[in-house]
A protein has these predicted regions:
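Mature N-terminal, pre-catalytic/accessory segment of carbohydrate-active enzymes
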Residues: 20-35, 39, 44, 441-448
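Glycan-recognition and processing domains
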Residues: 441-465
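Short secondary-structure boundary/capping segments
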Residues: 88-92, 133-135, 203-207, 234-241
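Aromatic-lined carbohydrate-binding/catalytic grooves of carbohydrate-active enzymes
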Residues: 36, 40-43, 49-50, 54-172, ...
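Extracytoplasmic, non-cytosolic globular domains
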Residues: 182-186, 190-218, 222-225
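Solvent-exposed beta-strand/loop surfaces of large extracellular or lumenal domains
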Residues: 404-422, 455-464
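Bacterial Sec-dependent N-terminal signal peptides
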Residues: 1-22
């Protein structure tokens, strides 16, 4: 029976939990943050978001999403034009054309009762900092030119070479600089580029320094990682890793279709969010790695059902719930972001698992997990182009010994479906899903939350990552 394999997998994983995972208040919570990010405007216009749009979106989030738990604002890429620096070479603004810098905007966000996230890589050095030959804070006479590497990220951003004296002080100093500005979330991008050009040992050394300085106060989001050896390096130093390609234009392509079923050994290993969440699901659990399915642009989905599908995937996988829709693009998608019953799962640190990690199987579209009070949450997804019936067996799949649910609740329709025996079944149209909460009768086969299977038993399927 399927449950026997699942139960064995979970029990063994509890005994063999990966002790090398980064231990922080964030990984202990289990799920990613809920926040707004400036990605959509930047992607659509292929340039940095202007200050007036930034302000309007902050105000919109404060009025429409903050009360639902989306309590953080984060800038995004297109960062090359951030060339305004302080005496030690650290950037003081998201963009040099902006009137105001980090101090002003961090206070503006904080005054609205929200936290601040920053998109930046501490291994970067701006062109301005290089040619100013700034003194590296914490060193005796070492300057920026002396720690720059031989390979640049691009014409405006250089890489720091970790083998050079002063590199540690630069990288740790950048993290400390952002922490002192009140930043609680650091989104570190283009990691594959550094590892590719400087090698895995140098890459790991840089991440180690970042994690040491971040401590338990700053959330570390690792973006565009190669995740060689199934994230062995990233697991030790990050709170959250990206598991699939960028959102880009969004839509069903991003959610489920792009390069479906295909795998690469380097970034991006998977082309769509669903495949990535399946493939790395064995790493995720409280005290382990948080999976990042990237940003949601729900306004790009075809209809309400597709919006619910993508949001449900992020919730079931324990991902960050990162809103990229804006005040003038979100439209009817706002109601999806405001589903308090789904949000509560994220609040409780809920992380679900697919019943199989084998891409393309129906079991990989059936996700299950357990809440601290013993209730089960089940997500059934139809990724296909034809209608399908999906079901969950209370005993075989969940281990409910009585085979009885005293109540099943539909979390999207906010409706109690009542008592059910043996199983729950749903007829799902293409690109739709259902998420239910099951209150079992009597004892279940296990009471522990679903744990990571990294370094424990493995699923019957390997996708090669």
């Amino acid at each position: 029976m399927k449950f026997k394999a699942l139960a064995s997998l979970i029990l063994l994983s509890l005994a063999g939990i990966n002790l090398s995972a980064r231990d922080s208040q964030f990984t202990r919570h289990g799920t990613g943050p809920k926040y707004w990010i400036a990605y959509e405007w930047c992607w659509v216009n292929n340039k940095a978001i202007p200050e007036y749009q930034w302000r309007k979106n902050i105000d919109w989030v404060a009025e429409n999403l903050k009360d639902y738990g989306y309590d953080m604002i984060c800038n995004d890429g297109w960062i090359e034009a951030a060339q305004t620096i302080n005496a030690n070479g650290y950037i003081t603004k998201y963009n040099s054309d902006w009137q105001n810098g980090f101090e002003y905007w961090n206070k503006y966000i904080s005054d609205k009762g929200m936290k601040v996230g920053v998109y930046y890589n501490p291994m970067w050095m701006t062109r301005a900092a290089y040619f100013a030959n700034c003194p590296v804070a914490g060193t005796d006479g070492i300057t920026t030119m002396k720690i720059a590497g031989n390979v640049n990220f691009n014409s405006e951003l250089y890489w720091v070479d970790v083998t050079k004296e002063g590199a540690e002080q630069w990288i740790k100093g950048y993290v400390r600089y952002f922490k002192n500005l009140g930043v609680s979330y650091l989104r570190i991008d283009f990691l594959e580029n550094y590892e590719r050009n400087y090698g895995t040992p140098a890459y790991e050394q840089a991440l180690k320094w970042i994690a040491e300085e971040a401590g338990d106060d700053m959330f570390l989001s690792l973006v565009m990682p190669n995740c060689y050896n199934h994230g062995l390096t990233e697991l030790k130093y990050g709170d959250m890793i990206r598991v699939s390609d960028d959102c880009f234009d969004g839509g069903w392509d991003f959610a489920s279709a792009r390069r479906r079923g295909e795998h690469k050994s380097y970034w991006p290993q998977y082309g769509n969010a669903f495949d990535g969440m399946i493939a790395f699901s064995d790493l995720s659990a409280k005290g382990q790695m948080i999976l990042d399915g990237d940003f949601m642009r729900l306004n790009t989905m075809a209809n309400k059902e597709e919006r619910r599908f993508l949001y449900s995937l992020m919730v079931m996988g324990g991902s960050a719930l990162a809103v990229a829709d804006q005040y003038n693009t979100v439209g009817d998608a706002l109601e999806v972001y405001q589903n308090t019953e789904m949000i509560e799962l994220n609040n409780q640190g809920f992380v679900g698992k697919p019943l199989s990690q084998k891409l393309g199987t129906w079991d990989s579209s059936r996700w299950v997990g357990q809440l601290p009070d013993g209730d089960y949450v089940v997500g059934l997804f139809n990724r296909e182009e034809n209608a399908a019936t999906l079901e969950i067996d209370f005993f075989k799949d969940l281990g409910i010994e009585s085979g009885v649910a005293t109540n099943v609740r539909d979390l999207w329709n906010h409706k109690d479906l009542g008592k059910m025996n043996e199983k729950y079944s749903a007829q799902l149209e293409p690109h739709t899903c259902v998420v239910i909460r099951i209150h079992p009768k009597g004892k279940t086969r296990f009471q522990a939350e679903f744990a990571s299977v990294k370094n424990g038993a493995t699923t019957s399927t390997s996708n090669g990552n």
